Amino acid sequence: MVLGIGENGHIAFNDPPVADFNDPLLIKPVELDAVCRQQQVNDGCFATIDDVPTHALSLTVPALMSAAKLFCSVPAKTKAWAVKETLTTDRIDEHCPATAMRKHGGATLYCDADSASMLEL
């Protein structure tokens, strides 16, 4: 599975308010919050926030974690907090859905210098 981490720590469209590490579904409809929608503009996917859909379909966290391998690519300084939180917080829970990858034995995280800028290396 190839995925990324959002500015608020989301994976797929599993944002902190709606992520569920025990979701019984594989795919679910989600409402995109303002942070997630603005990121779509920041990433160049849409010209304005008004162009960004308010809802999407997303693989759930358990569906993502069921993959044998996770290849997570995280470029951009705007994602530095999410990378730091994913790797260093004591909590592995829905406050930062990307923390779920820490329990996955086949996850690899690829960062650029900008997204890794908050890490103490």
Please describe what each predicted stretch is.
Residues M1-L121:
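Conserved phosphate- and dinucleotide-binding cores of soluble alpha/beta proteins
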